[in-house]
Amino acid sequence: MTRTATIERNTSETRIRLTLNIDGRGETSIGSGVPFLDHMLNLFARHGLFDLSLEACGDTQIDFHHTVEDIGIVLGEAFKQALADKQGINRYGQVTVPMDETLASAVVDISGRPYLVYNVDLPKAKVGDFDVELAQEFFQAFANHCGINLHINLLYGDNLHHIIEACFKAVGRAMDMATRLDPRVEGVMSTKGVL
């Protein structure tokens, strides 16, 4: 079974093409027009062992909001499409990741019920040109369009770059765990028989 997807999204604000291979090796080719997001998506894919190719062009002359949110939408849709009927997956993933002084956790349930809990209290600030509140916008769009419960918790940390990096790494690792195939799972991991 090949678990891949290619998604294109074209709006008046963004043009995005994304290809995902869930069963990859963490290889990436990413160009979003938002350098800090490129860095975070590289980390997400590398630590989740997903192959990810992304080309995006957005109205970044205004700000990065539309591009970041729309990439979250497209990445979520790609996972949803690649997972298809979710047969044989673990469904759940939970990881805690350190990044120097920072510790962050991500918990995933590929349930078909989108919900984000984002306990990452950050000041209104920037990392380079990137508004840190856009990380939450990205994860909200990703959770909604992937159809997952996603809980991200910052246990502690000071450096904004490290905090966001730990969150992306943790989500990548948790998604890897949740999407992993388990030969013991017959059908889907649900007493309802559907996810």
From Swiss-Prot:
High-level lineage: Bacteria, Pseudomonadati, Thermodesulfobacteriota, Desulfuromonadia, Desulfuromonadales
Enzyme Commission number(s) from the entry: 4.2.1.19
Assigned keywords, A-Z: Amino-acid biosynthesis, Cytoplasm, Histidine biosynthesis, Lyase
Gene this protein is translated from: hisB
Swiss-Prot/TrEMBL catalytic activity: D-erythro-1-(imidazol-4-yl)glycerol 3-phosphate = 3-(imidazol-4-yl)-2-oxopropyl phosphate + H2O
Family in the record: Belongs to the imidazoleglycerol-phosphate dehydratase family.
Species name: Pelobacter propionicus (strain DSM 2379 / NBRC 103807 / OttBd1)
Disulfide bonds: none
A Gene Ontology cellular-component term: cytoplasm
Pathway field: Amino-acid biosynthesis; L-histidine biosynthesis; L-histidine from 5-phospho-alpha-D-ribose 1-diphosphate: step 6/9
Subcellular location field: Cytoplasm
Top-level taxonomic group: Bacteria
Database matches in InterPro entries: IGPD_sf, ImidazoleglycerolP_deHydtase, ImidazoleglycerP_deHydtase_CS, Ribosomal_Su5_D2-typ_SF
NCBIfam families according to UniProt: PRK00951.1-5, PRK00951.2-1, PRK00951.2-4, PRK00951.2-5
GO molecular function, one term: imidazoleglycerol-phosphate dehydratase activity
Subcellular location, principal: cytoplasm
GO terms under biological process: L-histidine biosynthetic process
Pfam families associated with the record: IGPD
Protein name in UniProt: Imidazoleglycerol-phosphate dehydratase
